[in-house]
């Protein structure tokens, strides 16, 4: 489902935009039947105003699309998305709805808490050892899906604090995981220890 501008339309219209991609459960994950949804949200990097969104998923996609369509029409910003008080009951939604989560991620990007790089830019990263591509997924995920690139260093997030000595502070670190949450947490840990992430 889609509402507002997509990337192609924004580029064609000369609209400045950035995007975040979030992965959330359709309702409280501890309640049976929750399914993942992928939410791509376009926003104005200067003001945080929401410009467009696309969602792929199953249950609850229509509900989130309606909220985002209204947010775009009302000119809401990332900060206002985080404050939306949306319906919550474990079978139907989470305390922090996928729409709220998109707002939080946009806030973090705009505040400079994390520098995001999307999956399609990984091939452009130098493979000469001048940067570190760090994979923080679990060993099981890496066994099942493989590393993003053969030169990636695998340190699961749960082990990162104890293995910081394996990383070179003189090299920029690019972090990947399955959904972005662990990459964000890893970058916060690394930044707090003097790494450029």
Which residues make up each language-model segment?
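Positively charged, proline/Ser/Thr-rich regional signature most characteristic
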Residues: 124-177, 185
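A short, well-structured juxtamembrane/interface segment
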Residues: 113-127
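Hydrophobic anchor at the start of a short beta-strand
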Residues: 17-18, 152, 173, 197
């Amino acid at each position: 489902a889609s509402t507002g501008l997509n990337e192609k339309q924004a580029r064609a219209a000369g609209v400045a935009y950035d995007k975040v991609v979030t992965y959330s459960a359709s309702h409280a994950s501890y309640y049976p039947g929750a399914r993942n949804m992928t939410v791509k949200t376009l926003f104005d990097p200067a003001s945080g105003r929401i410009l467009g969104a696309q969602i792929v998923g199953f249950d609850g996609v229509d509900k989130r699309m309606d909220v985002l369509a209204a947010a775009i029409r009302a000119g809401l910003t990332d900060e206002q998305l985080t404050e939306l008080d949306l319906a919550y009951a474990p079978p139907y939604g989470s305390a922090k709805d996928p729409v709220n989560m998109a707002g939080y991620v946009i806030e973090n990007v705009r505040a400079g808490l994390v520098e995001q790089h999307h999956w399609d830019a990984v091939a452009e990263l130098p493979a000469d050892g001048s940067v570190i591509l760090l994979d923080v997924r679990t060993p099981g995920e890496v066994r099942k899906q493989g590393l993003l690139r053969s030169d990636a260093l695998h340190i699961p997030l749960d082990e990162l604090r104890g293995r910081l000595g394996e990383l070179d502070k003189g090299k920029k670190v690019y972090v990947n995981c399955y959904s972005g949450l662990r990459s964000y947490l890893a970058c916060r840990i690394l930044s707090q220890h003097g790494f450029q992430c």
